[in-house]
Amino acid sequence: MRLNKMTGRVIATMGIAAMMMTQTAGVMAAEQTENKQLKVVYYNQADYPGKKIGGSTIQAAGCGPTAVAVCYSSLTGKKADVPKMCKQAYKHGWYYTGQGCSHSVVPGLSKLYGMQCKGLGMDKDAVEKALRAGHPVVALMGPGDFTKNGHFVVLTRMVGKDKVKIADVGSRARTAETWSLKKVIRQGKEGANAGGPFWEISVKAGRTRL
């Protein structure tokens, strides 16, 4: 059977449209894969009045364990016992009275609670890649918007091309804000050890809440 020119053009147009729809769907699927969003469970240090970590209180010096607790509950869906995590930090020598938690508290507690921890140093690209994969990133912040000395927070997801959401375990107000990733990286604690000041936290495949 012979097709006239008009029919041929219609079929060709339909074919091109179908191809474009397929390509668009592929791009959308890729974007969704590259921008997984973590279901964040938030904890705040001030929610444990009077609870101790070493010779101090969780509210004053428990940001490290509380940040790891955010990662644990967000990734596994299980409730974290923040005071118990703080006791574990002290028991294992990751807390120094009068000084706060050591940088090793992040990989140490992560391993203790069955999570994987990867030190990212100050690598902005690695931090962004981790967040787009749905992995929280614990950050040890230096002097700036978050602290005058040192403070652990959790980067939870990318917003658009270069912004980030943060679970600040010491401030609900800062948690509600959206931050420049470049600015956050610049304010990372200089001289951090144990792979810091940024650590990617994850769990084995099949155990996440994504």
What is the role of each PLM region?
Residues 158-210:
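Noncatalytic regulatory segments and standalone regulatory/sensor domains
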Residues 9, 24-96, 178:
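Active-site-adjacent structural segments surrounding the nucleophilic cysteine of cysteine proteases
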Residues 116-169:
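Active-site-adjacent substructure of cysteine-protease-like catalytic cores
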Residues 1-30:
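Gram-positive cell-envelope targeting signals
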Residues 67, 71-76, 89, 93, ...:
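Sec/Tat-exported extracytoplasmic proteins
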Residues 59, 64-71, 81, 85, ...:
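Stable alpha-helical elements in mature extracytoplasmic
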